[in-house]
Amino acid sequence: MILLIDAGNTRLKWRLAGTGGPLEGAGVMADAEPLIGLSGYWSDIDRILVSTVASESARAQLHELLLAGAKVPVEYCWAESTRDGLSNSYGDVSRMGADRWHAMLAGWVRCKASFAVVDAGSAVTVDYVNAGGRHLGGYILPGLQMMRRSLKVDAARIGFEQSEQLDTRPGQSTGECVNHGLAWLTEALVQRIHRDAKAFGLSAIYLTGGDARRLQALGLEANVVEGMVLDGLERIASAGVL
């Protein structure tokens, strides 16, 4: 079996491919055992591919856990200049987060046409690809949870209770002003993505990540695809060697 891992800033997702049907799970990077769901499968794993944007210390901790569990080399998959007809716009591809590249690869393999991929995690990334597979560029923005945490920490005197309600009306209390303001900002992002999709003539918008449903609820007209980073890794794994 092949173990695929998407290790983000705060959470990780994993998938076991080659089991007749994929087995999937998730964990928190800071936990002592973020891969506890794999406890019954380690001996069956013969290959490990990882896409990560985690800090070096978090990556090293994960690396040790993987080596202790599976006893096979860990292969790290980073952004590339090109793969399967998809080409990167970055002059220095090592500066692109691996998760963005692998999500784009999954989108490209899925449609082979122009598209946007929106990954709504701790940060929100937006990337555009034309019909020829050329990455046109993208954006990186703070996600809903990151913005909320920032206000709690850096503007502690505001004092507000978190709400998951997605309301963009003007607030009538401090809590409403903050929570509605975050939804209002995100709705503005949604509108900009729609404008860009029209301007670039994109055929599809793919939406993935933990806050995908929230962006969809705020009006983003997109196909929600769970685990696009893992899909991209699985495509790389199917090619054999890196």
Curated annotation (Swiss-Prot):
Amino acids binding substrate: 90, 97-100, 174
GO CC field = cytoplasm
Q: Which residues form the active site?
A: 99 (proton acceptor)
Q: What EC identifiers does the entry list?
A: 2.7.1.33
* Positions with a binding annotation for K(+): 119
Please report which protein family the annotation says this sequence is part of: Belongs to the type III pantothenate kinase family.
Give the protein's function: Catalyzes the phosphorylation of pantothenate (Pan), the first step in CoA biosynthesis.
Name the record gives this protein: Type III pantothenate kinase
Species in which this protein is naturally found? Marinobacter nauticus (strain ATCC 700491 / DSM 11845 / VT8)
